[in-house]
Amino acid sequence: MRVLGIETSCDETGVAIYDTETGLLANQLYSQVKLHADYGGVVPELASRDHVRKTVPLIQAALREAGLQAGDIDGVAYTAGPGLVGALLVGATVGRSLAFAWDVPAIPVHHMEGHLLAPMLEDNPPAFPFVALLVSGGHTQLISVTGIGEYRLLGESIDDAAGEAFDKTAKLLGLDYPGGPMLSKMAQAGDSQRFTFPRPMTDRPGLDFSFSGLKTFAANTIRSNGDDDQTRADIARAFEDAVVDTLAIKCRRALDETGFKRLVMAGGVSANRTLRQCLGDVMAKRGGEVFYARPEFCTDNGAMIAYAGSVRLAHGASQTLGVSVRPRWPLAELPAV
């Protein structure tokens, strides 16, 4: 079974084709980073217009890459939420229209389920059950996962997501959008002993997160210590260490609560090398395993949507005629299969 996946939830246009027997056949991605860089963040209207321009050409490119024709596709999966409503509507409209024209099922996919299942594309996929750390620009959540659609929210950010905090702090440090990866690179030259940032909400029970205060702490530290290159690197290091340590503390608590031996991390921030090393050490000490996707499948992409769509389609999921998206969509509302 071959499924075409379309991702347009924010500022990346992703299209991929996944075959349930042979794996990923094609993967095309267009990033809008340069488009939004001058504005310091994603402009929803510009994002939607660029998706309109890029989605169909990327679908054509994916079919060429896979050496397939329209008649070879068995289903069309598209991101139906959460995300920017205009951007979502572009992918949903194109996906639903193609499914109707090709007389194949259309499968609406939850963006975060796509991220959660992305490690399944690797050679050593995780087995159920596991704790999932979903950490991106829009979400920071800990999820108990016992099967497809069997998701229980353990904790989440009460304000900024970790990725959002990275980008905002990077902006304070004078880095261009998107600043998170640049902040991490800057942190490599930082002195880990110079500044100590707080580990928010780790001094109390619970699995929720809060990262907005770290941005404020960074701003105050910058004002108090100047803005030379080394100071900025030291602040970046202290900030990254605080975020990574906070995530690790909460992951340990979630593993203790569930008793699971496997940890999956997914989302854009899961590509962070410091976080990968830290959680790898955590799981090694516990005699468990940590799983994550290759870096290109951590950020938004069509491959994760095609895969998640293939899993749902194999269990009978499809949408009737009509287009609907959900800018807000709790993961726990998804049906189990």
Curated annotation (Swiss-Prot):
* E.C. numbers: 2.3.1.234
**Which PROSITE patterns does the entry link to?**
GLYCOPROTEASE
Q: Give GO terms for biological process.
A: tRNA threonylcarbamoyladenosine modification
* Record-level Gene Ontology MF annotations: iron ion binding; N(6)-L-threonylcarbamoyladenine synthase activity
Keyword Transferase appears in the UniProt entry:
yes
Question: What's the source species for this entry?
Answer: Pectobacterium carotovorum subsp. carotovorum (strain PC1)
Report the subcellular localization: Cytoplasm
- What top-tier enzyme class does this entry carry? transferase
Keywords carried by this UniProt record:
Acyltransferase, Cytoplasm, Iron, Metal-binding, Transferase, tRNA processing
Positions annotated to bind Fe cation:
111, 115, 300
**Which cofactors does the annotated protein need, by name?**
Fe(2+)
Recorded catalytic activity of this chain's protein:
L-threonylcarbamoyladenylate + adenosine(37) in tRNA = N(6)-L-threonylcarbamoyladenosine(37) in tRNA + AMP + H(+)
What is one GO cellular-component annotation here? cytoplasm
- Identify its protein family: Belongs to the KAE1 / TsaD family.
Q: What is this protein called?
A: tRNA N6-adenosine threonylcarbamoyltransferase
What does the UniProt cofactor note say?
Answer: Binds 1 Fe(2+) ion per subunit.
